[in-house]
Amino acid sequence: MTLREELLEEHWSYMDRYEAQMIARGPTLDHDTPTGSVHVVDLPDPVAARAFAFNEPSYQAGVYRDVLLRRWRNLLGRTMWDFPGGRTGGNRYLVLGLGAGPAADLAVPPERDQLIAYGPLLSDDGTAWLGTAVLIRAQDPHVAGAILTADRYADIEVHSWQFGGRPS
């Protein structure tokens, strides 16, 4: 059993405290092997966001080496639980567009029914665009990554992702 598996109940209990603020959550995967985790949480300020991320039991125990912490704007105005496609079926991806230059992809694309979460990554004070984060159901990683305007980003990362949280 991995450390991540050993701490799963403790992780879920910690996340339960943020249930009302949770927009999306779940692991990134390489096939069936977890490679990371996504948590999109509506918190009041950068101090609360840092406390949420760095007090999480798995992070404290060393399960994660790095944490990317960014302000994000929810352009869909919903949570992953409101996604009309449900928790299962199809391939799901995290797409991270890391900004380079002027802001891009600020409007919700026409594929809205395939979007689980969508919005810009922003500086702590919310004034500077740093990129775009998307959770999407798509045929494959190439189609998922194509949701963003490629030449407007320094890099676009695409990771397999699945809905997280306690089993229903």
For every predicted segment, state its role.
Residues 1-168:
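Conserved, structured core segments of small domains
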